[in-house]
């Protein structure tokens, strides 16, 4: 599917790619330190000639911290924008405070829903809840809603069967969820449960989600569902959540956080989210565009580093990406088919690598696609990106 990438990967394995710095070039590069701007800019990236396909490593390093502070609260994207924040990438907490007005929902990844016995449920992770941070975000962004992710964790098949077949269990589950939202001053939840359950129980899961949504809506709370891609990556086969399920839940739920990333694997390295695949995932879910505004197209603010010799990959977040650019000064290549940038580099003893990581241009193209399709976006996650990305939102 991606001929350019297949050729590149073969070249990496064979060790014949000539874009890597020679030893003499590497010594010259090491003698110079790439500069990073630390001051804000009075212009957004769109007006600074930075949203282009032909990018250079030194320009990314120089500009990535320099966002337009004067427009940090102005929105450029009219649709819904959900941003995830995780405790393990704490920079996301600062991003939410600075750029909160660009988001309609912020989802801290704090909570787990566990079944403790018959009609007994507990939400764990409350020790991570930061009320002061929530107040600070809302102070600077009046309209933003705080909707923590709620993960169904450690549920067995028997747990699901017992709950989905019992109205009393579903009622107790809903009561527990609503009560925690009220106690903690949340605006709702992003529920992650669909991928944890085998397909034969999806009818019962739709029934449970319907009851949960009714209970949350009665308390004036939001419910957004995390859903896997509608087209299985690397195939033309339908995924676990398709138009059939979407059509039943779209009138009931407030949104769908669509996981349109992690397309490639360590065995088949390539782009994180090819543009044609993203489009197909939306069109399969809602071919008639009836509920498109509720679909939140997943945007990854992380990348992947593929090691040719080990047949392995590792996630790349902003700090590591910038350091890799500093250390190796690679030639960054635009894949026009996938609409993503990538580069290759060689470690001293670790062999050759290919890195895919979002850029201003790849993100702009996806935001334009979201506008065209009439969908919102969901970002995983705010602590992993580069600060100047937010000029685009």
Curated annotation (Swiss-Prot):
One biological process term in Gene Ontology: carbohydrate metabolic process
Domain of life: Eukaryota
Signal peptide: 1-19
GO cellular component term of the entry, any: trans-Golgi network
Compartments, record wording: Secreted; Lysosome
Pfam families: Glyco_hydro_18 (PF00704)
Record-linked SMART domains: Glyco_18
Membrane-spanning parts: none
Keywords, sorted A to Z: Immunity, Innate immunity, Lysosome, Secreted, Signal
UniProt-listed InterPro entries: Chitinase_II/V-like_cat, Chitinase_insertion_sf, Glyco_hydro18_cat, Glycoside_hydrolase_SF
Major subcellular location class: secreted
Domain GH18: 79-393
GO MF entry, a single one: oligosaccharide binding
Family statement drawn from the similarity comment of this UniProt entry: Belongs to the glycosyl hydrolase 18 family.
Subunit structure comment from the entry: Interacts with STAB1.
PANTHER family: CHITINASE DOMAIN-CONTAINING PROTEIN 1 (PTHR46066:SF2), CHITINASE DOMAIN-CONTAINING PROTEIN 1 FAMILY MEMBER (PTHR46066)
General function of this protein: Saccharide- and LPS-binding protein with possible roles in pathogen sensing and endotoxin neutralization. Ligand-binding specificity relates to the length of the oligosaccharides, with preference for chitotetraose (in vitro).
The protein's name in its UniProt record: Chitinase domain-containing protein 1
Organism, scientific name: Rattus norvegicus (Rat)
Lineage: Eukaryota, Metazoa, Chordata, Craniata, Vertebrata
């Amino acid at each position: 599917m991606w001929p350019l990438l297949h050729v590149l990967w073969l070249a990496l394995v064979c060790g014949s790619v000539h874009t890597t710095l020679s030893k003499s070039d590497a010594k010259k590069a090491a003698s110079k330190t790439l500069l990073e701007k630390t001051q804000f800019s009075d212009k957004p990236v769109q007006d600074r000639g930075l949203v282009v396909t032909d990018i250079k490593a030194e320009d990314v390093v120089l500009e990535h911290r320099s966002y337009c502070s004067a427009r940090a609260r102005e929105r450029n994207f009219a649709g819904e924008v959900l941003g995830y924040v995780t405790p393990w990438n704490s920079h996301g907490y600062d991003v939410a405070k600075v750029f909160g007005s660009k988001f309609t929902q912020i989802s801290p990844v704090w909570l787990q829903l566990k079944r403790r016995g018959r009609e007994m449920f507990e939400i764990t992770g409350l020790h991570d809840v930061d009320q002061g941070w929530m107040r600070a975000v809302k102070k600077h962004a009046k309209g933003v809603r705080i909707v923590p992710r709620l993960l169904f964790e450690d549920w067995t098949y028997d747990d699901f069967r017992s709950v989905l077949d019992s109205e009393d269990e579903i009622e107790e589950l809903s009561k527990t969820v609503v009560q925690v939202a009220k106690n903690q001053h949340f605006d709702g939840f992003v529920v992650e449960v669909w991928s944890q359950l085998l397909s034969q129980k999806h009818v019962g899961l739709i029934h449970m989600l319907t009851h949960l949504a009714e209970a949350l809506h009665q308390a004036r709370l939001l419910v957004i569902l995390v859903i896997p891609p509608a087209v299985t990556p690397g195939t033309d086969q339908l995924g676990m959540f398709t138009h059939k399920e979407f059509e039943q839940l779209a009138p009931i739920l407030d949104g769908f956080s669509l996981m349109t990333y992690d397309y490639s694997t360590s065995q088949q390295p390539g782009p994180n989210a090819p543009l044609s695949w993203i489009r197909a995932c939306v069109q399969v879910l809602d071919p008639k565009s009836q509920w498109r505004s509720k679909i939140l197209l997943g945007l990854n603010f992380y990348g992947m580093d593929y090691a040719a010799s080990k047949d392995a990959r590792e996630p790349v977040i902003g700090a590591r990406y910038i350091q890799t650019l500093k250390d190796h000064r690679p030639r960054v290549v635009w894949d026009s088919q996938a609409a993503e940038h990538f580069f290759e580099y060689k470690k001293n003893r670790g062999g050759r690598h290919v890195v895919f990581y979002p850029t201003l241009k790849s993100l702009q193209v996806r935001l334009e696609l979201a506008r065209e399709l009439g969908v919102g976006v969901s970002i995983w996650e705010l602590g992993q990106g580069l600060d100047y990305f937010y000029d685009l939102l």
